Amino acid sequence: MTNTEPNAQGVPADAMRRLAELEPGKPGSIFTSDLSVNEFLLVREAGFKPIGLVLGSSIYHVGIQIGRWGKNQELETLSQAMYHARELAMTRMEAEAAALGADGIVGVRLTVEAREFGNDVAEFIAIGTAVKGDNPPPGGGSWRNNKGQPFTSDLSGQDFWTLIRAGYAPLGMVMGTCVYHIAHQKMGAVFSNLGKNVEIEQFTQALYDARELAMARMQAEAEALHAEGVVGVQLNAHNHRWGGHTTEFFSIGTAVRPLRADHEIERPTMVLSLDG
């Protein structure tokens, strides 16, 4: 009888067996990857070898929190649920990469998919390609981040190559989330604005506040990694199944650190073909 119990990070035993069968570094071993051909070649050119496709999953029941009809407010219970579910998926993906002895994970995709197990049930999935550096970073040390974990990055293979060539390295994906209830307008305000071009300040302030909260939380994660900055930031809004007045604002990007003082890359040169 096979053991199907997950390990301490929640990674299933079947996943650990799959990773063990890859045997990275041994003669005849294979790798798996969701990189395109161009991305794969550029990651190799940057000095990293793909060693395996890694993923993390969390099927999460998101609880209920009701916002006041006429008040702009963060729904902290829902914010915490969305953050924790994504964090579980990311942690399990990182655990798979660590089991392979990877230095990092590139091309990470983090998605949310509604499931039919219930109205408030969703699967949070993190997937990417684990890689290992051919050599230590310039100046020595490790490609892993200051927490000793494999770095994570949602940059494409092309952007990853450019980042490394320019003298930077990824530290980790950083994110911030805020689920916000946007107040309903009073009937008098609705009628007073009929036929007018006018800013609805109540809505403007709600969306502004929610995005700022998400951005601030992402920046705090980057500071915890001692990053110099965050690149490739995406700021998205998702209604999920909460209705039109409750929205999740989600900010995500890749925290980076410098590898050297010089951050210039070679300028492209023009090549004139002698073929007819």
Please report, for each region that a protein language model flagged, where it lies by residue.
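Short, well-ordered alpha-helical segments
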Residues: V54, I59, R68-R109, G188-Q234
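Short, conserved loop-to-beta-strand elements that form functional interface hotspots
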Residues: G104-E116, G229-W242, H263-L272
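Intrinsic disorder/low-complexity detector
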Residues: M1-L78, V121-F203, T254-G276
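Short flexible/disordered coil segments
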Residues: A89, G172-V179, A214, Q234-H238
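C-terminal functional regions that serve as terminal interaction/effector modules
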Residues: V198-E201, A220-G229, V233-E264
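Hydrophobic, ordered structural segments
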Residues: A85-G139
